[in-house]
A protein has these predicted regions:
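Start-transfer (signal-anchor) and selected internal transmembrane alpha helices
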Residues: 1-24, 211-228, 302-305, 320-321
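Multi-pass, polyprenyl lipid-linked donor-dependent membrane glycosyltransferases
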Residues: 36-39, 99-107, 123-162, 175-178, ...
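Membrane-interface transmembrane helices that cradle and orient dolichyl/undecaprenyl
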Residues: 87, 117-120, 158-180, 188, ...
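Transmembrane-helix signature of polytopic, membrane-embedded enzymes
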Residues: 10-14, 110-135, 152-153, 169-176, ...
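Signature aromatic-anchored transmembrane alpha helix within multi-pass, membrane-resident enzymes
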Residues: 8-15, 200, 204, 226-230, ...
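Hydrophobic, aromatic-rich transmembrane alpha-helices
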Residues: 107-110, 206-207, 213, 284-324
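Perimembrane helix-loop-helix junctions
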Residues: 161-170, 175, 197-238
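Hydrophobic/aromatic-rich transmembrane helices and adjacent perimembrane loops
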Residues: 41-42, 141-142, 148, 191, ...
Length: 509
């Protein structure tokens, strides 16, 4: 394959993204789970790595609390659809768990470049790839154990495959892009179902248009994409049946009965249920956080987006509008979910990140007088007009430098030891003297849940690790639990007194 100079630069940016994400995972998040979601994903991944979707519920299930891992009819299983846990489980099985999201980060940057190159030309593709690489929003999520980097790759791959075969002006007769489009959207549905609906929506409108106005061959490809993605998405129903015994029982509702998409009583935590007022508050705050975390330019991360939209409309670039519509669709559809997500930026919109980086790249190129269409020639300027691109480069350089020197380091540092959870919390159990106590049941007496949650990094779902950790439920329940593990010594642990193990509850506790 012949690579252009721009392709090689994009490849370097993609490799830098892998390195940057790995460093964030290692230096900021210390390769341990912090969010409840991450803990649950790891639990599922470890179970799947050994071939299990469900496990028998342990004795005293509340003692072995794992967030978002459900006990139902004597079985224990995670509430999340299988897409991301399976991929993470492959990483666990191969011993490369900590590399999965960094590798996906690099692939996400590469696919963003490919989308930009296809729709707007190499210059915009490189701008979008560079903006992605320097985005605090991108770096935080790429260093996490969350599903969003996988979702971004699937979303971008779907958009690229759709445009390869069905985009305006496409003449490709090949079946491969059709298969890839169906598979990637279907896998996204197996990973983040509501996100898949939102990502697919702009393309669904285009697909309906093609069904009415396209030739028979085009219609076949549209129907094939829809059929493949729906067939894969329907596997969620089989998974629900496998773990709950009911095709239509969503495991989310077994943890919180109100954890559903929709409005009214029974949706969300308020008595009256989710409503448009709450939706507006959530959305507004998500966007407020988002336009700071997007590029780290303070309140001005959005500054080039209007010019990008203007350029797309002037050039009547309908492919660009479709791709740009992904983030708008995500914002619109997540109005129907009762809670927002802000700690890692507005991560429910993450799978549409390329919409924002591409449109920002188009805006920059448009203002600088650079090409914003594939194969468009570079214009030469004379006189004062020569200052136009130089001024844009200077402004962009200033913004990116300010982000990399100030905003991103501060933002990432704010995530270190999130919720007070650090790898140092595990050290009391890794000393030679502690290892001599194993195998042991450790009953944890935490001041807050996170003091217990961080220790789950040393435990697996099968409870066959040197130490297994139980959340104290009171002296009687703790004693009964200890009797269920006669082959293990029992110790009581107080996180505010590390390196000290008690053979019974501490005096005065």
């Amino acid at each position: 394959m012949n690579m252009s100079r721009a392709d090689r630069i994009a490849l370097i940016l993609s490799l830098l993204a892998v390195v940057a994400a790995f460093l964030v995972a290692d230096r900021i998040f210390e390769n341990i789970a912090h969010l409840e979601d991450e803990i649950a994903y790891l639990w599922q991944a470890q179970a799947i790595a050994r071939g299990d979707l469900t496990l028998p519920s342990p004795p005293h299930p509340h003692s072995f609390l794992v967030p978002f891992v459900v006990d139902h009819k004597g079985l224990r299983f995670g509430k999340y659809p299988l897409g991301w846990p399976v991929l993470l489980g492959i990483g666990v099985r191969l011993g490369i768990r900590n590399l999965i999201n960094p590798l996906l980060a690099g692939l996400g940057v590469w696919l963003t470049y490919r989308l930009g190159k296809k729709i707007f030309g190499e210059a915009v593709g490189l701008l979008a790839a560079g903006l992605t690489l320097t985005s605090p929003f991108f770096l935080m999520n790429s260093g996490s154990l969350l599903s969003h980097p996988f979702g971004l790759v699937l979303s971008a791959a779907f958009a690229l495959a759709w445009l390869d075969r069905l985009g305006p002006g496409s003449t490709s007769p090949e079946i491969l892009p059709t298969i890839v489009a169906g598979l990637t959207l279907g896998l996204l549905a197996l990973t983040r179902p509501w996100t898949a609906v939102a990502v697919g929506l702009p393309f669904a409108f285009h697909g309906l248009y093609l069904l009415f106005r396209g030739d028979w061959e085009t219609r076949r490809h549209v129907l094939a994409v829809g059929g493949i993605s729906l067939a894969l998405g329907a596997l969620n129903l089989l998974w629900q049946y496998a773990v709950t015994g009911d095709f239509l029982l969503n495991p989310y509702t077994l943890w919180w009965s109100y954890d559903k998409i929709g409005f009214g009583p029974g949706y969300g935590i308020t008595k009256s249920g989710h409503n448009l007022d709450i939706a507006w508050i959530n959305t507004r705050f998500s966007l407020f956080v988002g336009y700071r975390d997007l590029f780290g330019w303070g309140a001005y991360s959005w500054i080039f987006l209007p010019f990008g939209l203007l350029a797309v409309l002037i050039k009547r670039n309908w492919r660009g509008l479709m791709v740009g519509g992904v983030v708008a669709s995500l914002i619109l559809l997540y109005v129907a979910y009762w809670v927002g997500a802000w700690l890692y930026g507005p991560r429910y919109y993450y799978e549409g990140l390329y919409s924002l980086t591409l449109f920002s790249g188009v805006g920059i190129a448009f203002l600088a007088g650079w090409p914003v269409q594939p194969d468009a020639p570079w214009k030469s300027y004379s006189g004062w007009w020569q200052a136009r691109p130089l001024a844009l480069v200077a402004v962009l350089g200033l913004l990116v430098s300010a982000n990399l020197l100030f905003y991103t380091p501060l933002r990432l540092q704010s995530m270190y030891g999130l919720y007070g959870m650090e790898r140092a919390d595990l050290q009391p159990f890794l000393t030679p003297s502690a290892q001599k106590l194993a195998p042991a049941l450790v009953i944890v007496h935490p001041d807050q849940w996170m003091d217990y949650g961080v220790l789950l990094s040393l435990e697996d779902p099968f409870l066959d690790t040197p130490f297994i950790f139980a959340y104290t439920q009171g002296s009687k329940a703790d004693a009964d639990l200890a009797s269920k593990f006669p082959d293990r010594a029992t110790y009581h642990y107080y996180p505010d007194k590390p390196y000290t193990f008690y053979i019974g509850p501490a005096p005065g506790s």
